[in-house]
């Protein structure tokens, strides 16, 4: 396997192949095949997302994949932002369609004509829905599995509210949702507000969640958008107020994709392979029997006990592979916890355990299994977050002049907000502005022009 530190790009591609996450040999560029192990990880990520939004009164829907050109063109600024990325369906069978149909690049234009039918009065608000679907964008840059592709596994939440204040409260709730998700995936991040020229087409403002990979490049792993009434006015989404007058709904959206999996791979993996957070590991505990009297029966008993407390567990009973091969194989697949069982463990009623991200072995009593394993999985997750935060901090640097932008990582510096200064920074340092740091109230002189500025984040990005 490639060395992660010396050649991150090759290491990343190799680990996806070796761990059997995805197969990019499908004969349409940028549309990869999800393999069972990769799809199971993604499904577990989706489950975390669903739990986080379901308990906050979102409801799941599923909209058609095709959007008529006339529906897209209702919001001109929106379609202009995607016009170079849209796949168009122009024929049905042999007949040319009367109206071109787009494969959804995102779902505003599909959903909002329906919002205008569903929302009639203040009693219908707030409306909070989401879907997890494929979206399609004709990506012309170099494609990379889970990072830059043409068929994207996409979570999108859409809301409508009676007032701007209610919509702003929803934006705050999105941050709360993201904190919950990121804590389980062990992903550190920045909140930053994108500059106007980089916000989502049609939005009042966009806030992104950015992390940094060991290559020093940033990876956008989520965005939230405040639409105000920009879309509701164009799609005629209005409601009857209590005073008998009509007003337009205020809207927000939240988007994430399989880049979450890319971040997990890139941030947590090592030269042995994947390191998976326990909450998204298809197999949380792998049991390796060391051949001997009574070993397999003992291993099955341990497996049944862990199954009974909802631990995802598997006994590796393959006969033609050595224990050493199995150790390496499951390490490469990122299984958080390994249990070794030989004749000694059977005799002593013990278990030998190894954690994927913490060196060394421990011996635990069989009688304490149902307590020790869940506690150990929590310890693994906490250590993963600790390690990830260290890597994140090691790749964030403060700069007071352009000469200090030459490090591999995220740069924080004061910026006045002008496009001219942003362009100068990019031209001289190859780093572009991500946005103003949302959680920072610091002010100072712009690193380029010396005018008053706020703290911003800059990087090379995927």
UniProtKB/Swiss-Prot annotation:
BP-aspect Gene Ontology terms: prolyl-tRNA aminoacylation
SUPFAM superfamilies membership: C-terminal domain of ProRS, Class II aaRS ABD-related, Class II aaRS and biotin synthetases
Keywords: Aminoacyl-tRNA synthetase, ATP-binding, Cytoplasm, Ligase, Nucleotide-binding, Protein biosynthesis
Catalytic activity entry: tRNA(Pro) + L-proline + ATP = L-prolyl-tRNA(Pro) + AMP + diphosphate
EC number annotated for this UniProt entry: 6.1.1.15
Enzyme class: ligase
CDD domains: ProRS_anticodon_zinc, ProRS_core_arch_euk
Alphabetized PROSITE patterns for the sequence: AA_TRNA_LIGASE_II
GO molecular function annotations of the record: ATP binding; proline-tRNA ligase activity
Alphabetical list of InterPro entries matching this protein: aa-tRNA-synt_IIb, aa-tRNA-synth_II, aa-tRNA-synth_II/BPL/LPL, Anticodon-bd, Anticodon-bd_dom_sf, Pro-tRNA-ligase_IIa, Pro-tRNA-ligase_IIa_arc-type, Pro-tRNA_ligase_II_C
Chief location of this protein within or outside the cell: cytoplasm
Compartmental location: Cytoplasm
GO cellular component assignments: aminoacyl-tRNA synthetase multienzyme complex; cytoplasm
Source domain of life: Archaea
Pfam families: HGTP_anticodon (PF03129), ProRS-C_1 (PF09180), tRNA-synt_2b (PF00587)
Protein purpose: Catalyzes the attachment of proline to tRNA(Pro) in a two-step reaction: proline is first activated by ATP to form Pro-AMP and then transferred to the acceptor end of tRNA(Pro).
Domain notes from UniProt: Consists of three domains: the N-terminal catalytic domain, the anticodon-binding domain and the C-terminal extension.
Family stated for the protein in its record: Belongs to the class-II aminoacyl-tRNA synthetase family. ProS type 3 subfamily.
Assembly: Homodimer.
Name assigned to this protein: Proline--tRNA ligase
Origin species: Thermoplasma acidophilum (strain ATCC 25905 / DSM 1728 / JCM 9062 / NBRC 15155 / AMRC-C165)
Name of encoding gene: proS
